[in-house]
Amino acid sequence: MHTNLRTFLKQLEEYGKAHDAQEPEHSRKLLNLEADTAELVSILAQSACAKRALEIGTSNGYSTIWLAASIGPSGGRVISIERSREKQTMARENPAKAGLLEYLDLRLGDATGVIRTLPGPFDFVFFDADRSSAPDQLDLLLPKLSSRALVLADNALSHPEQIAGYITMVNGLEHFQHVIVPVGKGLSVAFATLT
């Protein structure tokens, strides 16, 4: 990743922290990934040679930029879903400033509804939104996963009660290896071997 992009991401990271510290309404907070988590998500996407990634929860595009920079130049594409129009506006502006908009397909709407309309296959999925809806969304995505897909979810340690249904579901899936990595707020990493 080139220096200018790292500088821009650092600015977004700092803006996100300052914004969230002042914003009293939870739904208006940006809730960006921690830098270490974003770096790990990027490394995993590159290592998987992901070509078709799905991000659930775009926010202002911070993690979306990490994903697009990781897989876009090698032919990958990121579909990212956000339900807040205000956040999606930022999510369109920020990747454009980073020169990565061409690798993105930004969708506005309820993620569960949007997922129903999306064709597969996906070889990389990143859940970073409403944790209580994640099990239903994963259920919709299972038939749309590639045979060796990576499925990630943030907040696995910071919000254990809210993400418990998702973690239980992933742990119960045959042909999935799963681990929670203690980085940032906890990153759930599941590898599907659906041969």
Segments (PLM) and residue ranges:
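A short alpha-helical cap/connector motif
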Residues: M1-F124, R131-L152, A156-T195
